Amino acid sequence: MVAARVLALVVDQGRSLKTELAAALPTLEDVRDRALVEAICFAVLRRRPVYEAALTQWLARPLGRGDAQLRGLLMVGFAQLDVLKVPPYAALSATVDACRVLGWPHRASFVNAVLRRAQRERLPVVSSDAAWPRWLAERIRADWGELAEAIFDASLKPAPMWLRVNLRYGDRHTYVQRLQAAGLEAVPSGLVPEALALDCSMPVLQLPGFQAGEVSVQDLSAQQVAALLSPAPHARVLDACAAPGGKAAHLLERAPTLCLTALDVDMQRLRRVAETCDRIHVKARLCVADATDLAAWWDGEAFDAVLLDAPCSATGVVRRQPDVLLHRRAEDLLPLLNIQSRLLDACWRTLRPGGVLVYVTCSVLRAENQTQLEAFLARTVDACAEDPGDAYGQPAGLGRQRLPGEQGGDGFFYARLIKEI
């Protein structure tokens, strides 16, 4: 029932899945129920075109606009049978009971009949890009050719839960042993010394040492950013779009003496940076401002290193944010390109000669990545790009691109820029 309501808000009212889950899950007392609702919502959004095709084929009359919650409930039932492999009797019973709780006893037999058909028959087969808006799928194909299918396929699969071990409290091997003592298994990454991939997802607060700051949750691709920036101890560092704070926290875990300014335009999101810093026991200067408005926040003292994790289309993290494909519009792209360009220009002004600026996005669109970088270099005479290296993915112009799922990480673009002296 909770999952059906969340899905109706996300699919039919354009709400954020992350926001709606954050509001809905605390209403459930049992952590197992919370995990099930979250798993159902992600499964439905990843498999929504399949379930829509099934309803189109199986229903004599299509569901109307007023049936959003009923459609969501049917998809909840499909997901339990199709992805989560809940025993059929349990999936049918729970979904039919939800009809009665929602005040639809007259629809219980209808829901039961549809789910029994799903149990008997195969669900329709749809193309791997069926969930992607046509304009976006066409752009992915134009950018990536034969690799487009791999992007679409990877975006349908659940993302692994990556952990970042805080090496100030102990080494990675010791933390793996703690996980094993708790009945959990994890695989170390060869790319980042702090990174571990859990064999299954779990509630963050149940991770050993999480609340004490001994471990954090952060995707592998995001964890690689700290080494690419690699500021010296005591350096002045700017994280220009800092929220929710994972990259700033990682930098400070590695070098607690950094003088790091965490900047974000959103006060609520910046509070999350503060909470993260408090949890891992590091200090940062927090500033609420638009990074492009230098007069509003910058004191004129240059930074040694700047991290610009720019707002983007999020096309590299669809496996973690499947509702991106519901909400992203073609007209969103140009404003994003404009703000990325303005952020690059503004942040560059704050960087000292000889300093390093790292530009990253969680996008796989060339317009936001190598094309954006090439345009910046063309208009910025004192900027030069250094190749991040093979550990950061395949060459993408003067940067590097990891596609979703490669080496277990999210889709990410990386560029390392040096300000000439």
Curated annotation (Swiss-Prot):
Binding annotation for S-adenosyl-L-methionine: 241-247, 264, 290, 309
Active site: 362 (nucleophile)
Transmembrane regions listed in the UniProt entry: none
Pfam families registered for this protein in UniProt: Methyltr_RsmB-F (PF01189), NusB (PF01029), RsmF-B_ferredox (PF22458)
Alphabetized UniProt keyword annotations: Cytoplasm, Methyltransferase, Ribosome biogenesis, RNA-binding, rRNA processing, S-adenosyl-L-methionine, Transferase
Keyword rRNA processing in annotation: yes
Protein name per its UniProtKB record: Ribosomal RNA small subunit methyltransferase B
Organism: Xylella fastidiosa (strain 9a5c)
Gene that this sequence comes from: rsmB
